[in-house]
Amino acid sequence: HGSSAASDVYKRQIYDPVGGDFSEQAFRAIAWNGRFLVIGFASGPIAKMPLNLALLKGASLVGVFWGSWSAREPNESQNNFSELIKMVDDKKFIPLVTEIFKLEDHASAFACIEERRAKGKVILSMK
């Protein structure tokens, strides 16, 4: 059917940096043998998951905490960071920038983040 094993893995993964009410719905929608990656809780509340879903879906629920992982696996962390920078350089990964503030407006930029109004990256411009 033309897809590689690697692309099939990506189709069975859910990356959740938001948490909250939609986490359980997303986990209910996961494919058989899928992986649900818990990245963070940007929405505020920490989701409560019925663990029987992992059993019924044959799925894995994996916590991904960058700080601990990079401290425990520094070589792998550096390799991942280098790969990410290459993807940005090659325009294969383009971060979504939704807010740009002048440096002197830094308080407004931080307020945008703290009040959860930012939908993408918030940039402080020195120009």
What is the predicted role of each segment?
Residues H1-Y10:
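Single conserved hydrophobic/aromatic residue that forms the stacking wall/gate
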Residues Y10, K57, K119-K121:
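A general lysine-centric signal
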Residues R12-Y15:
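N-terminal Rossmann-like NAD(P) cofactor-binding module of classical short-chain dehydrogenase/reductase
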Residues P17-V18, F101-D105:
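Short beta->alpha linker loops
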Residues D21-F93, S125-K127:
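Glycine-rich phosphate-binding loop and adjacent beta-alpha segment
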Residues A47, E99-K102:
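A structural signal for short, well-ordered beta-strand elements
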Residues L53, D105-S108:
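An acidic, carboxylate-rich microenvironment
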Residues I85, D90-E99, A107-K127:
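C-terminal capping/lid region of NAD(P)-dependent oxidoreductase domains
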